[in-house]
Amino acid sequence: MIGRTHMNGTVTEETIGQAVQLKGWVQKRRDLGGLIFLDLRDRTGIVQVVFQPENEQAHRLAESIRSEYVLDIKGTVVQRENPNPNIPTGQVEVVADEVIILNASKMTPFPISEEAEQTSEDLRLKYRYLDLRRPSLQETFRLRSKASNIMRNFLDEQDFLEVETPILTKSTPEGARDYLVPSRVHPGEFYALPQSPQLFKQLLMVSGFERYFQIARCFRDEDLRADRQPEFTQVDIETSFMDVEDLYAMMESMMTRVMKETLGKDITTPFPRMPYAEAMSRFGSDKPDTRFGLELIDVAEAVTGAGFKVFDMALESGGEVKALNVKGAADQFSRKDIDKLQEFTAIYGAKGLAWVKVTADGLNGPIAKFFDEAATARLVEATTAEAGDLLVFVAAKASIVADSLGALRQKLGKELGLIDETVFNFLWVTDFPLVTFEEADSRFYANHHPFTMPRREDLDKLETDPGSVLAVAYDLVLNGYELGGGSQRIYERDIQERMFKLLGFTEEEANEQFGFLMEAFEYGTPPHAGIALGLDRLIMLLAGRTNLRDTIAFPKTASASDLLTAAPSPVSDAQLNELSIRTAVKQS
């Protein structure tokens, strides 16, 4: 038998009485006293097939069939006696006339169903080709394909050109570590896999393309987290002569279409905007989740004079005292529970987590004794606290207060059910500092990358007060995740040279690394700006998943290993000799 008349998921009541030919995998087999039932699965769904004893040849073969066998079946669609309302094909079944076993299967190491979620992820990654058979994962990749095509079509309608940029490129010292590729024809020299197409897309603007996009593969040798992978995909966009307001509007239109055509959700535009400083002050994060409140509250004035030394010392040294008001949670948290919260904030540098519970009579807790009636009134007013609320405090330098309370806010939001998981809140975070000073290195680092344009009105401060200079940079945030980041780019050589100098490059180093770019700026480079959206992360959020690996067909583990192919792996001495390489493995 060859051919296929129907996909399994399309065999519904409209096909009753029709002869069909189906192909697929056996999801489940049941032998019920003569009748044998199979659930046959393909990429569109599952349909029940019944083998009757009267058809001896097909019935005999069905007795030998097991889960995940690949079958070719001919039969007739009939009304099902016991319908299954949970699946689209549940009103019908196929009475088998003929069956061919196209391939048998060993017993799988885990069930090809949602029960596999209980299996260790390492085992599922080792047998990724089996894990990918699960309908929920296949649905995620259909979503990914659809979203990619929506964005590609949208950008094509806006007259953007899709241009591929090099994968073998030049190593640069900024950002994460590069993945290096040795050159055989240039012994001792290396290419780098691109961390982004940043330089090439800017050069395409110099080339006069004006509007570019690419669904680009990027590579960063950095420590992994649940939402990071060493190789990832971004929707990369660059445009000339478009001001930032127009770029915002274009991206909002694109995301509106993605949300509508994938999830059927309408979202409101324009997206809210929030300066970086406000995001850090209110939410303790530059990617705030605005689906719930529980904002950080500055209580410096309220606690001044209370006499609690920890607060006083933090304020005297230029730090902050901020609080979270966990509404109605006083009775939910025991001292032991609060100790666990303190251990959590310690991860982010907080040396302690002070707390009080608000009662009808005032305050209760370890630091309540420091608050007299007047101080209690000030604190209650500052935090809008009521009886039954739990107030938690961190006193430290601003960065530690933001990091620790911001992380605690997110943790409590999830654990207390404060987040509406059906909501998608987009947000532009703007006005980032251009650079950050790292005390450990005694130097400035670019907050985004070295090619980000400072605000024109701040250029005079680039050498004298660089820490106060703001960038024309913006991040698109969705539900507490950075979905993408972009900026207006430097396009004048003198500003780029000043930026490199600020970042600690000597003139020689800047020319060696980026001389080609600065020379290009001397040939009539237009003003340009762009953005890159993380496709893997976008799909993770659209699909309601929490692990980025679920959106990548063949992902790496947290240790950057591929358990399926056993990569990375040693290579032969002959290969190394051909590349003029000798390995020297560090002893751990």
UniProtKB/Swiss-Prot annotation:
Originating gene: aspS
Gene Ontology CC terms: cytoplasm
CDD domains reported for this sequence: AspRS_core, EcAspRS_like_N
GO terms (BP aspect): aspartyl-tRNA aminoacylation
Upper taxonomic lineage: Bacteria, Bacillati, Bacillota, Bacilli, Bacillales
Binding positions for ATP per the UniProt entry: R220, D221, E222, Q229, E482, G534, L535, D536, R537
Taxonomic superkingdom: Bacteria
The protein, known as: Aspartate--tRNA ligase
Cystines in this chain: none
Native organism: Exiguobacterium sibiricum (strain DSM 17290 / CCUG 55495 / CIP 109462 / JCM 13490 / 255-15)
The family this protein is said to belong to: Belongs to the class-II aminoacyl-tRNA synthetase family. Type 1 subfamily.
PANTHER family: ASPARTATE--TRNA LIGASE, MITOCHONDRIAL, ASPARTYL/LYSYL-TRNA SYNTHETASE
Functional note: Catalyzes the attachment of L-aspartate to tRNA(Asp) in a two-step reaction: L-aspartate is first activated by ATP to form Asp-AMP and then transferred to the acceptor end of tRNA(Asp).
Compartment(s) of residence: Cytoplasm
Residues holding L-aspartate: E174, R220, H448, R489
Reaction(s) catalysed (UniProt annotation): tRNA(Asp) + L-aspartate + ATP = L-aspartyl-tRNA(Asp) + AMP + diphosphate
Pfam assignment, any one: tRNA-synt_2
Keyword field: Aminoacyl-tRNA synthetase, ATP-binding, Cytoplasm, Ligase, Nucleotide-binding, Protein biosynthesis
Assembly and binders: Homodimer.
One of the record's GO molecular function terms: transferase activity
Region (Aspartate): 198-201
UniProt xrefs under Gene3D superfamilies: Bira Bifunctional Protein, Domain 2, GAD-like domain, Nucleic acid-binding proteins
Keyword Metal-binding: no
EC number: 6.1.1.12
